[in-house]
Each structure stands twice: as C-alpha cells, then as structure tokens.
Regions:
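Acidic donor-binding segment of Leloir-type glycosyltransferases
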Residues: 1-14
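Short beta-strand-to-loop acidic/aromatic patch adjacent to the donor-nucleotide binding site
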Residues: 32-46
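A near-ubiquitous, low-amplitude feature marking generic local secondary-structure context
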Residues: 7-8, 35, 77, 129
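Active-site nucleotide-sugar/metal-binding loop of Leloir-type enzymes
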Residues: 22-35
Length: 186
C-alpha cells in the first residue's frame, strides 16, 4: 500500500501541539486516504508489530496505539510509566478518513490526538517505540521544556521524567502479541 509522509515547519511562537496536528489534518484533507496515523519524529514502529494494513478493512473510526518509552537503551523501556499498563501506554494516534476534520481540545499539550474517539479499539498489531526519553540528558531537556511550556497545567506532574530517576525497566523483546491484544480487554 502507498504511504504519504507530511512534515510541517512553521514559525515557533510556543509549543502548540494541537495547532501542529490540526495543520496536518488540514493538509491531509486534500488526499484520498483510508487511515492516518500521527508519529512524532522521535517515534518509530517496532518491526515485529507494524501491520498497519490489517486495519484497512474494519469499520473502526479511531485506534489507540500501544506505545513504550525507551529508557537508557533502545532495548529497554520504562515499565513504571504513569497511566500505562506495565509500561505500555495506549494512545489515540490512528484514525479513519471521514473528511475534513479537526481535533477539538481545550489543551495545547497532552490531548487525544485523533479527531474522533467513537467506535475505537486498541490496534494490537502495532507497537510504537518512543525514543524521546532515551537518555538522561534527553529526559532533562524534556522535563525542563514541559515545565516551561505547560502553562495550562495540562498534566499534573512531570516528575516521572525528571533526570536521574531509576524506574523499573523491561525489555522491548518481552512484549508479546498476546500482551498487546489483552490491552483491548482492560
């Protein structure tokens, strides 16, 4: 199947993730697509769990994509990440084309990144690896950026990414198809 990757660059006034995603939604409205997924520059698909085509024929409008935050190694992830299930965080990131749409949120940060959440399920054949907190230095930069940029208190705390934290880690290789499938049951 064909893939289209869109990247935008705009003048940065402040970190406004909502505006960025809505600009991308404006752009993709000119294309005939079946499903779309938001992936950030520091995120990539685990090759074992990257079957996007399995979602082309169902009737779901939105999908929660399992995601892990890599920590100190590309082979390990933070198993104690807040709002996760053993370190796996299902996030709204993939959705079906239903015409021009926008994400509605009162927050600029930490919102559901799809225009519609009705008729949703976990995409258990996909796993996103987030490398944005891989090193202590990266976590320090992210921690400081969020403290500065999150003027609306979109998230109650960023202590979980504070530098020098030593959470319990799990191997990415330990994640099984069954574990991802069981995210739908919870």
């Amino acid at each position: 199947s064909e893939k289209l990757i869109l990247k935008i660059q705009k003048e940065r006034i402040c970190f406004d993730d909502l505006s960025n995603r809505n600009i991308l939604l404006d752009l993709i409205s000119f294309f005939n697509y079946e499903i779309a997924m938001f992936l950030d520059a520091d995120e990539y698909l685990d090759v074992r769990f990257s079957n996007l085509s399995s979602y082309l024929s169902d009737n779901r409008l939105a999908y929660l994509i399992p995601m892990v935050n890599l920590w100190d190694s590309e082979k390990m992830f933070n198993a104690e990440y807040p709002y996760s299930i053993s370190g796996i965080s299902p996030r709204y990131r993939m959705f079906r084309n239903f015409g021009h749409c926008q994400i509605q949120s009162s927050k600029r940060l930490h919102f559901q990144q799809v225009p519609c959440v009705q008729n949703a399920t976990v995409a258990s054949e996909i796993l996103v690896l987030h490398s944005g907190m891989l090193t202590d230095e990266m976590r320090k930069q992210k921690f400081e950026r969020y403290l500065k940029e999150d003027t609306e208190n979109c998230q109650s705390s960023y202590e979980h990414i504070r530098p020098k934290k030593c959470p319990k880690l799990r191997s990415v290789e330990e994640i099984t198809q069954e574990e991802l499938y069981n995210l739908n049951i919870r």
